[in-house]
Amino acid sequence: MMRTHYCGSLTEAQIDQTVTLCGWVHRRRDHGGVIFLDMRDRDGLVQVVIDPDTPEAFATADKARSEYVLKITGRVRRRYEGTENPNMVSGQIEVLGKEIEVLAASETPPFPLNDDTINVSEEHRLKYRFLDIRRPEMLERLRFRSKVTNLIRNYLDDHGFLDVETPILTRATPEGARDYLVPSRVQNGSFYALPQSPQLFKQLLMVGGIDRYYQIAKCFRDEDLRADRQPEFTQIDIETSFLNDDDIMDLMEGMTIKLFNDLLGVKFEKFRRMPYSEAMRDYASDKPDLRIPLKLVDVADLMQEVEFKVFAGPAKDPKGRIAALRVPGAGSLTRSQIDEYTKFVGIYGAKGLAYIKVNEIEKGIEGLQSPIVKFIEPIVMQLLERVGAENGDIVFFGADKAKIVNDAMGALRVKIGHDLNLATCEWAPLWVVDFPMFEETDDGKWTSVHHPFTLPKSSVEDVKSNPGEALSVAYDMVLNGTEVGGGSLRIYTLEMQKAIFEALGISDEEAEEKFSFLLNALRYGAPPHGGLAFGLDRLVMLMTGATSIRDVIAFPKTKTAECPLTQAPAPVEANQLRDLGIRLREQQKKEA
């Protein structure tokens, strides 16, 4: 062993012991002929003192610079009174260095690793990710991620789950996003697909009698990237047999409660279970942030006869919605603040943001301040009564197609709640249940809300006759407005699976071509089964307070799905393409 201790592990318990440390020079200081080195490794920092009484070590320390890799042997001693550092685990002690060996020199880093006040662009950090990872903040996040996966593995092992790997090279299936395709050299003209999830394989494992499966799986989706998306991401994938939806939710809830208690000291009570219809009605979101107590109220029925087309149109449209959002005590918002909120909802397609300020409700119309009151005067007091408005409140209105209203007003609810510090708690977990089985596309076709293997609550006959009314046995775990996990019970009979394919417009021929392996499995006695998957990256991001998934992944991609470190994706040699039977079309030269 090259070292006896980690830098960050030294405490007063090691005083008077001789230790050997290996790590990087975090900071070097020269004070009155004595050199101080802050040495850093994975576990933290320790101060090393080198004085001229050890000339060889002093000479080596004199040449050392930031990020040099050193091996230091010395004696642990208590720091002099008044020089302790309460911000370091090792802040009560220091190491008097006797021997120093330079294991590797370092060029000057492209950005300082010992000064968090200097703003470094994310692109630059990702280009030199091997240096960025050395920063204590990044090291701690990756260490925390390791603790999360370790706890999850132990929990699932203790509950009888088997860790089983599923293929990375598989075939394309319709799962909602574009596949990453891998050409086959042996089967020219054919392609593998990288898995968007292990969904079908884990179902086949249940048919195979594995009973309880889990995997920390890499998944791939070729989709537009946002702050919470990566082209490759990690999923905690879980499937069980002979458990119902309540059993599965209880099991996964227990794991989440243990995770937060053991790693953050946060104690959760029993998770609330909210039907999808209630979530959309009250919060305009299928992943509501319950830290914010504000709720939306439907008022379309009151707007049926008003002459104001902005309200009358959506009120009479079967696909429209008019929702009111009462914000208690926010009547003091200025016009410029309201204008900013109007711009904000515009991001989601809203054409405007109507509002009423309630100054003195006992005065009726005269006690209100609003540019829309004159258009809805006959029903305005009914509106305010329905939303429970009081003096000092402001009520916002969204009126449009239901999707636009939900997107805009749902986002506004959360933004105003945070802007005005209305959050009532730090963590708000819940389950959203009873999702619709299908949703209608613009061209009148049905598509799966989750995926085509989700078990409906309806019978085969009801699915065939009225798919729009079918609910699914699906459940999403939501935390602070973020979906951290989602799952369902699965279809386990051939008759139901064919009925779902039929509702989705998938012909028998197409189903056999794409899913023959699954359909065959259902012919041989599939058990009732279900499961879910957690997004590991998203979960760790929430638990560490990071602002982006990229901050909790060792080597992430950018928003354009590129890796600045390795410069992937990159062109390949012509002979490699030739072996794959692929020829690239030449791009037409741009006209000068």
UniProtKB/Swiss-Prot annotation:
It catalyses: tRNA(Asx) + L-aspartate + ATP = L-aspartyl-tRNA(Asx) + AMP + diphosphate. Keywords: Aminoacyl-tRNA synthetase, ATP-binding, Cytoplasm, Ligase, Nucleotide-binding, Protein biosynthesis. L-aspartate binds at E175, R221, H450, R490. Residues 199-202 are annotated as: Aspartate. InterPro entries: Aa-tRNA-synt_II, aa-tRNA-synth_II, aa-tRNA-synth_II/BPL/LPL, Asp-tRNA-ligase_1, Asp-tRNA-ligase_1_N, Asp/Asn-tRNA-synth_IIb, AspRS_core, GAD-like_sf. ATP binds at R221, D222, E223, Q230, E483, G535, L536, D537, R538. One of its GO terms (molecular function) is nucleic acid binding. The record marks H31, G82 as: Important for tRNA non-discrimination. It comes from the Bacteria. It is found in: Cytoplasm. The keyword DNA-binding does not apply. Its EC number is 6.1.1.23. It is an enzyme of class 6 (ligase). One of its GO terms (cellular component) is cytoplasm. Aspartyl-tRNA synthetase with relaxed tRNA specificity since it is able to aspartylate not only its cognate tRNA(Asp) but also tRNA(Asn). Reaction proceeds in two steps: L-aspartate is first activated by ATP to form Asp-AMP and then transferred to the acceptor end of tRNA(Asp/Asn). Homodimer. This is Aspartate--tRNA(Asp/Asn) ligase. It comes from Acinetobacter baumannii (strain ATCC 17978 / DSM 105126 / CIP 53.77 / LMG 1025 / NCDC KC755 / 5377). The lineage of its organism: Bacteria, Pseudomonadati, Pseudomonadota, Gammaproteobacteria, Moraxellales. The gene is aspS.
